[in-house]
Swiss-Prot record:
Reactions catalysed, as given in the entry: ATP + protein L-histidine = ADP + protein N-phospho-L-histidine
Pfam families cross-referenced by the UniProt entry: HATPase_c, HisKA, Response_reg
Modification sites for 4-aspartylphosphate: 1050
Functional description taken from the UniProt entry: Essential protein. Functions as a histidine kinase and transmits the stress signal to a downstream MAPK cascade. This protein undergoes an ATP-dependent autophosphorylation at a conserved histidine residue in the kinase core, and a phosphoryl group is then transferred to a conserved aspartate residue in the receiver domain. Required for the development of megagametophyte in female gametophyte (embryo sac) independently of cytokinin.
Name recorded for this polypeptide: Histidine kinase CKI1
Origin species: Arabidopsis thaliana
Transmembrane regions listed in the UniProt entry: 13-33, 346-366
Cytoplasmic face residues: 1-12, 367-1122
InterPro entries: 2C_system_His_kinase, CheY-like_superfamily, HATPase_C_sf, His_kinase_dom, HisK_dim/P_dom, HisK_dim/P_sf, Sig_transdc_His_kin-like_C, Sig_transdc_resp-reg_receiver
Membrane topology: Multi-pass membrane protein
Effect ascribed to mutating residue 1050 to Q/E: Loss of histidine kinase activity
Subunit (UniProt): Homodimer. Interacts with AHP2 and AHP3.
Residue ranges, compositional bias (Basic and acidic residues): 918-928
C-alpha cells in the first residue's frame, strides 16, 4: 500500500497537492462547524448549574445517610454477642432474662448515643425492652410465651429507675404483638443473621417511628433490637438548604419520611413510585419511575416542568428512597464573545496548516519514493526466500514428527519385546542382566527423544501448560526421595530445606505439576551428577509477587493479541505502562503466589563467565562435563519451561569460600484456597523474610491444660491471652545426632521454628555427655553448642505468626508447668558411630531420667531387627518433610501421648503400621487430623521415572512387626490389586499396522487375563470386523454381549487411520445403540494435539506405545461405565 502511495506522489505531485488541500479545507469546515455548535451548547448555563447543584445536594444527602447512625449495626452485633455469651441453658425463662439479660440491655440503653429502644426477644416470644418516652423511661416485657396454647400472651409496661434500670411501681397491660411471626423476626432468625427496618417502637405510649437494627444471636435462641428515632434523620434533612428545590423520601413499604416542597398536597406513593397531582375532584396523576437516577426524568406538574433525580441511601442497613425535584427556569449565555474570538483564531491557524502541510507532505513523499522503490525489489527477493524457507521448515517439521512417531513406536516395541524375553529367562542370570541393560538404554533413548521434542515444541511455540490441582510439598518430597538413594551411593546427601515453612501453608496449588517436576528433576539430576561429596539442598518458599520480583508474567498477551495491543501504544513508554498495569493486576490477585526454588550443591561449580551461556542449547561446561555424557539441552529446556510458567531462572552467588552452584528459579502458581483479609499480614511477614510457623497443612495439634486441643492454624492472639493465664512447665526436647552437617542445620532450624527446644550433638562421642548434662543445669547455664540452642534469645524469641497475621510472641504461654509430661525425643543416625555403643548410651540415659519424663528414640538408617528397646522406631529413608512432621507428632505438644510403661507388641505393630504416629494407650487417644492434613498416614516407597514424558508413583504400606519404616524389602503393595488376570474373560481387538506393536500389545493383554485377542493391520479391517460382529450379534439374539470388550486403535495407519476408523465405528454402533470402549495407541505425548484429536474423534482414552498405564486407563473406563 505504501509503495502505491509513494508511486502516485512521485508521478503526479500537483494532483496530490490539490487533493490534500481540498481534504484539509473540508476538514477545517467540519471542525469549525462542530466548534460553533459546541460553543453554543456551552453557553447554556442552566444545565451546568443544575448539575452542580444536584451533585452537591446528592453528596450532602448521602453523607447524612452514611454518618447518621453509622455504628448502630456494630453496637447491635456487639450486644448480641455479649448476651449470647451469658445464655447457657437451652430454655431461657423470663427469670433468667430479667436477672441476666435485662442489666445488659440497660447498660446498652444508657451508653449508646441517641438510642430510643433496646429489646431482647426470645424465639418463644419472651421479651424485655427499655423504651425512651417524653421525659422518662419505661420497660415493656412479656413474661409468657407466645406459643402457649392458653392464649394469655400479654405485654406489660412499667416505669424504671433512670440510674439503675430497676422496675418501679406497678405494671400495666399494654397492646401486645406476636413479634415471632413478623417478617423481620423471621428474617433475622433465618440465614440472614441481621436485618433492619423502619417501624414503630415495641410498646410504649408515644409509638415513635424508629429505625430498628435487629441481630439474631449466634445460638438462634433469640434476637436483639436497637431502635433509633427517625426524627433525628428527618430534622437533619429538613435543615438542608435546597436552593428552591424539593426533596421527598420514603421507605420501601411506602412510609413517607421527608416531604419538603410546594407539592406536598399532591404527593403520594403508588407501587413504590412517587406520584403527584391527585386532588379531591381529579383522577389524573403524574408518577416518576424508579430508574430516573441516570440522567433525570422530565415531568410536568401543575403546568410547571421539573427534572427529577432518584436514588437510594442506606441508613443503618435500611434502604431509603428519595427524589430531588429541580424546576427548569431557563438561563443565559455569558461566554459568547470569547467563543467567537477563539473561532476566528482557529480559522487562521487552520488556513495556514491547510496549505503548509500538503506541501511538506508532497516533498517528504517524493524523497521517500526513491528509498521505497529500492526496497521493493529487495523485499520481493526476501519474501521469496522466506516462503521457500517456510516450506522447507514445514516439511522438516512434518518429517520430524513422523520420524519421532516411528521412533517412539520402535522403542516401545523394543521395550515390549525385552519384557517378553525377560519373562522367559531366569531372574538374575546373565541374559536377564543384559536385557535389563538394553531396557535402560531404551529408556535413555526415550529421554533423549523427549528432550529433542520438547525443544522443538518450545521453538515452534506449541508448548502448552496443562494445569491441574496438586500438592506442592508432596511433589518436592517425591523428587528428593527419588534422587536420595542415587546420591547416597556417592556419599552425597539430598536435603529438603523448607526455609520459612510457607511452602507448606500454600502447598495446595494449581499449575502444571508435570513441567514443574521436570524442572526440578533436571536440576537435581545435574546436581547429583556433578557433586562428588557434601550435600545437595533443595530449598523452597512462597511470597507475594512484588515490584522487585523478576517474574515474567505468563499471562502477558502473546501473538496477535500482543500485536493488537502494540497498535495502540504510540511509543515504548506506553507499551511499558501497559505491561506494568498487567503486572500489577496479577500481583494484586490474592490467589496468585510466587514460589521460589533453590537447588544448592557443593559440586565443582560453574565459572562466572559461563553462567549466561550455560542456558543456551547444546552448551556444556567443559570443566564440569568431563566424564559425563549429555546433549546440553537440559538447562535450555529448563529455562524455557520456567519462563513459560511465568518465572525466571538464574545462578546465584554463593558466600566466599563455598564451592558448588546454586540455581534459583521462581514460578507463578494459583493457590486453591482464597486467603482471608488477615492473611495479607502473614504474607507481609513472609516477604519481610521472617520465620513462618503457622502452617495449617502440617496438621500439628497442641494439647492444652483444659483437656482439649488447639490446632496451630486456629491460633489467635485472643486465644493466646487465654492460654497465658495458666502456668506451664518445661516442654519437650529434641536431641539430634545426624551425620550430615547440612541436614543437621536444616532440621535444627525447622524444629526451633516450631517452638521446640533442640540439642544438637555433632559426634557420637559427645552424645553421652550431652545427655548427662541435659537436665543437670538450668536453661541459663552454658554447655557449648548443645545447650546454646536451649537458652539463647534467638531460640526463645522465635516469631510465632498466627493465621490472623499477628506476631504472637509476647502472648505465647511460657513452657514451665504444662499439664502433660515432658518427652525427650532422640533422633539418632546409626551411621554416626557404633550402633551397640549408641544403644548402651541411650539405655543409660533412660535409667537416669527424672520421674515424669519419658524418652522416645528414632533410629535413622538402621534396621529395626537390631533395635532392642521396644517402642523405638527405625527409619531407612531420609528424615524430612512429612516423615519429619510425623516424628514431631510423637511429642505431646503436637498430639503425642506419654506411655507409663513400654508398649505391648500389638501396640508396637500399630506404631509401625501408621508410620510414626505417636503411641496409643486405652486411656489416651490422640486427636488425628482430617483429610486436609498433608501427611499421608501410609508413608512408603515412592518411585518416579526419570524421564520427562512418563512417571509412575507406587505407594507401599509398611508391614507390621519389628521392621524398619520405609525399607523397600519390607514393603508390600496395597494401593491397588495386581494387574495379573485383570481382564479375565475379555475379548479384545488390536488394530495396528506394525507387527511388533501388535505382538507386544497382545502379550501384555494376555498377561492381564484376556481370553481372546484378535488382530488386524488397518482401520478398514477393524471397521469390517466390528460391523460383522454387530450383525452376527443381532442375528444370534445375544444383545447383551458386544463383539469386542475393548478396541486398541493405532492412530496413524495407511489406507484408513485410527481417527477415521473410530468415526465410522461410532456411526455403525449408533444404529445398534451400543458403544465399545476404544483406546487410542500412539507414539505422541499424552498432552499433544494428536491426543486431543483422539477424544474429538470419539475415542475413550489415550495411551502411548509403551502401554505402561494400560491398567489405570481400563480401571478409569470401567469406573465411568459402572
Amino acid at each position: 500500500m505504501m509503495v502505491k502511495v509513494t508511486k502516485l506522489v512521485a508521478s503526479r505531485p500537483i494532483v496530490v497537492f490539490c487533493v490534500l488541500a481540498f481534504l484539509v479545507v473540508v476538514f477545517e469546515c467540519i471542525w469549525i462547524s462542530n466548534w460553533r455548535t459546541t460553543t453554543e451548547n456551552l453557553v447554556k448555563e442552566v444545565a451546568s448549574f443544575t448539575e452542580d447543584l444536584r451533585t452537591s445536594l446528592v453528596s450532602e444527602i448521602e453523607n447524612i445517610g452514611k454518618f447518621t447512625y453509622a455504628k448502630t449495626n456494630l453496637s447491635t452485633i456487639g450486644l448480641a454477642r455479649v448476651i449470647d455469651s451469658y445464655i447457657t441453658n437451652n430454655d431461657t425463662g423470663f427469670t433468667e432474662i430479667q436477672t441476666q439479660i435485662a442489666p445488659l440491655l440497660f447498660v446498652a440503653y444508657s451508653t449508646i448515643l441517641q438510642v430510643s429502644q433496646v429489646s431482647y426477644i426470645s424465639r418463644d416470644g419472651l421479651m424485655f425492652s427499655y423504651i425512651a418516652e417524653s421525659n422518662t423511661s419505661v420497660a415493656v416485657f412479656a413474661n409468657s410465651s407466645s406459643n402457649s396454647s392458653r392464649g394469655d400472651y400479654t405485654w406489660y409496661t412499667q416505669t424504671v429507675d433512670q440510674l439503675t434500670g430497676r422496675l418501679n411501681g406497678n405494671s400495666t397491660k399494654s397492646q401486645s404483638l406476636d413479634v415471632t411471626h413478623t417478617d423481620w423476626f423471621q428474617a433475622a432468625q433465618s440465614n440472614n443473621y441481621t436485618t433492619a427496618f423502619v417501624g414503630t417502637s415495641l410498646g410504649g405510649e408515644d409509638n415513635e417511628t424508629l429505625i430498628q437494627s435487629v441481630v439474631s444471636l449466634y445460638s438462634k435462641k433469640g434476637l436483639v433490637s436497637l431502635g433509633f428515632p427517625v426524627k433525628t434523620l428527618t430534622e437533619v434533612l429538613n435543615s438542608l438548604n435546597l436552593h428552591g428545590e424539593e426533596l421527598y423520601m420514603w421507605t420501601k413499604d411506602g412510609t413517607v419520611l421527608v416531604r419538603e416542597g410546594s407539592l406536598n398536597d399532591s404527593f403520594f406513593i403508588s407501587n413504590g413510585s412517587i406520584c403527584f397531582g391527585r386532588e379531591s375532584n381529579s383522577l389524573w396523576s403524574q408518577c416518576i419511575p424508579e430508574n430516573c437516577s441516570s440522567s433525570g426524568y422530565e415531568v410536568e406538574i401543575k403546568r410547571l416542568r421539573y427534572q427529577a433525580f432518584c436514588s437510594v441511601i442506606e441508613v443503618s442497613g435500611v434502604p431509603l428512597r428519595y427524589t430531588l425535584m429541580f424546576p427548569n427556569k431557563g438561563g443565559a449565555t455569558r461566554i459568547k464573545h470569547q467563543a467567537e474570538k477563539a473561532k476566528y483564531q482557529l480559522i487562521v491557524v487552520m488556513i495556514f496548516l491547510g496549505f503548509g502541510w500538503p506541501v511538506w507532505f508532497v516533498w517528504f513523499m517524493m524523497q521517500a519514493t526513491r528509498r521505497e522503490m529500492h526496497m521493493r525489489a529487495t523485499l520481493i527477493n526476501q519474501m521469496e526466500a522466506t516462503q521457500q524457507a517456510e516450506r522447507k521448515s514445514m516439511n522438516k517439521s512434518q518429517a520430524f514428527a513422523n520420524a519421532s512417531h516411528d521412533i517412539r513406536g520402535a522403542l516401545a516395541g523394543m521395550k515390549g519385546l525385552i519384557d517378553i524375553c525377560r519373562d522367559g529367562v531366569k531372574p538374575g542370570s546373565d541374559v536377564d542382566t543384559t536385557l535389563n541393560q538394553v531396557n535402560v538404554c531404551a529408556k535413555d533413548l526415550v529421554a533423549l527423544l523427549n528432550s529433542v521434542l520438547d525443544m522443538s515444541k518450545i521453538e515452534s511455540g506449541k508448548m502448552q501448560l496443562v494445569e491441574e490441582d496438586f500438592n506442592l510439598s508432596k511433589l518436592l518430597e517425591d523428587v528428593i526421595d527419588f534422587y536420595h538413594p542415587v546420591a547416597m551411593k556417592k556419599g552425597v546427601d539430598v536435603v529438603l530445606d523448607p526455609h520459612d515453612g510457607s511452602v507448606f501453608k500454600f502447598s495446595n496449588v494449581r499449575g502444571d505439576s508435570g513441567r514443574l517436576k521436570q524442572i526440578l528433576n533436571n536440576l537435581v539430576s545435574n546436581a547429583v551428577k556433578f557433586t562428588v561429596d557434601g550435600h545437595i539442598a533443595v530449598r523452597a518458599w512462597a511470597q507475594r509477587p512484588g515490584s522487585n520480583s523478576s517474574v515474567v508474567l505468563a499471562s502477558y498477551p502473546k501473538g496477535v493479541s500482543k500485536f493488537v495491543k502494540s497498535m495502540f501504544c504510540k511509543n515504548k513508554e506506553e507499551s511499558s505502562t501497559y505491561e506494568t498495569e498487567i503486572s500489577n493486576s496479577i500481583r494484586n490477585n490474592a490467589n496468585t503466589m510466587e514460589f521460589v526454588f533453590e537447588v544448592d550443591d557443593t559440586g565443582k561449580g560453574i565459572p562466572m563467565e559461563m553462567r549466561k551461556s550455560v542456558f543456551e542449547n547444546y552448551v556444556q561446561v567443559r570443566e564440569t562435563a568431563q566424564g559425563h555424557q549429555g546433549t546440553g539441552l537440559g538447562l535450555g529446556i529448563v529455562q524455557s519451561l520456567v519462563r513459560l510458567m511465568g518465572g525466571e531462572i538464574r545462578i546465584t552467588d554463593k558466600a566466599m569460600g563455598e564451592k558448588g552452584t546454586c540455581f534459583q528459579f521462581n514460578v507463578l502458581l494459583t493457590t486453591l484456597e482464597s486467603p482471608p483479609v488477615s492473611d495479607m499480614k502473614v504474607r507481609q511477614e513472609i516477604e519481610a523474610g521472617g520465620d513462618y510457623v503457622s502452617t495449617p497443612n502440617l496438621g500439628l495439634t497442641i494439647n492444652t491444660s483444659l483437656g482439649g486441643s488447639m490446632n496451630i492454624r486456629n491460633l489467635s492472639p485472643r486465644f493466646n491471652n487465654c492460654l497465658s493465664s495458666s502456668p506451664k512447665q518445661e516442654g519437650s526436647r529434641v536431641v539430634l545426632l545426624l551425620k550430615n552437617e547440612e541436614r543437621r542445620r536444616v532440621t535444627e532450624k525447622y524444629i526451633k521454628n516450631l517452638g521446640i527446644k533442640v540439642t544438637v550433638v555433632e559426634k557420637w562421642e559427645h552424645l553421652s555427655y550431652a545427655l548427662e548434662r541435659l537436665f543437670g543445669f538450668s536453661p541459663q547455664s552454658s554447655m557449648g553448642r548443645a545447650e546454646c540452642s536451649l537458652s539463647c534469645p534467638s531460640s526463645r524469641e522465635l516469631p510465632f505468626i498466627g493465621m490472623d497475621g499477628i506476631d504472637s510472641r509476647s502472648q505465647l504461654p511460657k513452657r514451665r508447668s504444662i499439664s502433660f509430661s515432658a518427652v525427650v525425643l532422640l533422633v539418632i543416625d546409626a551411621k554416626t558411630g557404633p550402633f551397640f555403643e549408641l544403644c548402651d548410651i541411650v539405655k543409660q540415659f533412660r535409667r537416669g531420667l527424672p520421674h515424669g519424663i519419658s524418652c522416645k528414640v528414632v533410629w535413622l538408617n538402621e534396621s529395626s531387627t537390631r533395635v532392642s528397646e521396644r517402642g523405638d522406631i527405625s527409619c531407612s529413608r531420609p528424615l524430612h518433610g512429612s516423615r519429619l512432621m510425623e516424628v514431631l507428632k510423637m511429642l505431646p505438644e503436637f498430639g503425642g501421648t506419654v506411655l507409663k510403661e513400654p508398649p505391648t507388641e500389638l501396640q508396637r505393630e500399630s506404631l509401625l503400621r501408621h508410620s510414626f504416629v505417636a503411641e496409643r494407650s486405652p486411656k489416651h487417644k490422640v486427636q488425628e487430623e482430617g483429610p486436609s492434613s498433608m501427611f499421608n498416614k501410609k508413608l512408603g516407597k515412592r518411585i518416579m521415572a526419570s524421564t520427562d514424558s512418563e512417571s509412575e508413583t507406587r505407594v507401599k504400606s509398611v508391614r507390621t512387626g519389628r521392621k524398619p519404616i520405609g525399607n523397600p524389602e519390607d514393603e508390600q503393595e496395597t494401593s491397588k490389586p495386581s494387574d495379573d488376570e485383570f481382564l479375565r474373560g475379555k475379548r479384545v481387538l488390536v488394530v495396528d499396522d506394525n507387527f511388533i506393536s501388535r505382538k507386544v500389545a497382545t502379550g501384555k493383554l494376555k498377561k492381564m487375563g484376556v481370553s481372546e485377542v484378535e488382530q488386524c493391520d488397518s482401520g478398514k479391517e477393524a471397521l469390517r470386523l466390528v460391523t460383522e460382529g454387530l450383525t452376527q450379534r443381532e442375528e444370534q439374539g445375544s444383545v447383551d454381549k458386544l463383539p469386542f470388550d475393548y478396541i486398541f486403535m493405532d492412530c496413524q495407519m495407511p489406507e484408513m487411520d485410527g481417527y477415521e476408523a473410530t468415526r465410522e465405528i461410532r456411526k455403525v454402533e449408533k444404529s445398534y445403540g451400543v458403544r465399545t470402549p476404544i483406546i487410542a495407541v500412539s507414539g505422541h505425548d499424552p498432552g499433544s494435539e494428536e491426543a486431543r484429536e483422539t477424544i474429538q474423534a470419539g475415542m475413550d482414552a489415550f495411551l502411548d506405545k509403551s502401554l505402561n498405564q494400560l491398567a489405570n486407563v481400563i480401571r478409569e473406563i470401567e469406573s465411568k461405565r459402572h
